Every structure is written in structure tokens, then in C-alpha cells.
Amino acid sequence: MKMTAIAKASLALGILATGTITSLHQTVNASEHKAKYENVTKDIFDLRDYYSGASKELKNVTGYRYSKGGKHYLIFDKNRKFTRVQIFGKDIERFKARKNPGLDIFVVKEAENRNGTVFSYGGVTKKNQDAYYDYINAPRFQIKRDEGDGIATYGRVHYIYKEEISLKELDFKLRQYLIQNFDLYKKFPKDSKIKVIMKDGGYYTFELNKKLQTNRMSDVIDGRNIEKIEANIR
């Protein structure tokens, strides 16, 4: 009888211990799932807020170069309103002079100090060398969207007004259009991408599940040589 009682007690303790462990394991999994969900949700909100936000363009302005702490900047003064743009890659060599006139800037505000100076990344191009009365290129823009029961395809054109255009400007304007017209960031975009295809067969890709990398915001391409643009929303 004693052995039976001991066995029963051991079994009960084992069930209780196992139950506690299982419950704890489930709680940990639930917490991890919640944290992951909250992070994904925050990522979507951050992307949607950024690409739904305001942008501005400064035309035919002069950028004054300075460097500090290994970083390189151009300062623009437009009617006593200052914009500081951090530059990367080839722009560091392109704009080595202290004074760089004849520039167009695509600005998205990353921050602003107490004096009203706006901080931005890249988006610097040289102004058009020829005169144009309208757009200079109108590549086909094809949008494919997963709509549950299949893939729907839509088409339009995307007008280009610059001989030089930054990846920053292309990325921002294309995503903003998709947000406004195709519910981009209504859910997490997973493997969604935009592909800008050039006439020579080269291409540039924007991954829609993250913000364009800051160093790529300085990259510039010839707007006249864009063949077509494709977006896949999944």
C-alpha cells in the first residue's frame, strides 16, 4: 500500500510539474509571438508614416560642402531656411568643391533642430542641362498585387522630369503612389519589391519591407534611360 501511495504521489507531482512547465513554455511562446507581432506592426506603421509624409524639392540651388567626424554634408540656404544633406558614395567625390551650384535636391525630413534646419539624406542631382516643356521620359509602370484569389495586374506610366534622378526620389514617389492607390503597408509586405529596369538591361531593386538604405539615397541614375518599372505587392 505504501508503494502504491508513493507511486500515486510521484505521478501527481510529475503531472503537476509537467503542467507547470508546459504552461510556462506556452507563456514564453505567447510573449515572443506578441513581441514579434508588435515589432512587425511598428515596422509597418513606421514605413507607412515615412512614405506617406511630405517631401519637397529645391531647384537650382547651391550646396556648400563641409565634413565633420568622417561624415560629409552639403548645406543649402533657400530664403534663409537651411537644409543639411548628408551625402554618400560617389557624391563625396562629385561634390568635393566648397561651393557647388546648379543642384536640385529631393528632401524628406529626417529630423529638424531648434533653429529650423532640416536634416535629410542624399537626393542630390545636377539640374537639367537641356530645356524641357514637359516630362522627359514616361516609362511603363506595371503593378502586380496578390488579391487572395489570384494576381491582379495594373498598368500606368510614371513621368520623369529630370535627366539625373536619385534612387531616393524614385523610391519615395513610387511607394507613396502604391500607398495611396494599392494599400501598400495595410499589411506586412513580405517579399514585395519595386524593380526599375534600364534600357541597357540593368536594374535597381527597392525592397518594400524596409526603408531604402541611407547610402543608396545618394545613388543617381539617368532618368532618360529608364525602360520600365515593375512593382510586385504580396
Swiss-Prot record:
It comes from the Bacteria. Residues 1-30 form the signal peptide. InterPro entries: Enterotoxin, SSL_OB, Staph/Strept_toxin_CS, Staph_exotoxin, SuperAg_toxin_C, Superantigen_bac, Toxin_b-grasp_Staph/Strep. Keywords: Signal. The keyword Disulfide bond does not apply. Induction: Induced by Sae and repressed by Agr. Interacts with host SELPLG; this interaction prevents SELPLG-mediated neutrophil rolling. Interacts with host MMP9 (via sialic acid-containing O-glycans); this interaction inhibits MMP9 activity. Interacts with host GP1BA and GP6; these interactions play an important role in platelet binding and activation. NCBIfam families: PRK13035.1. This is Staphylococcal superantigen-like 5.
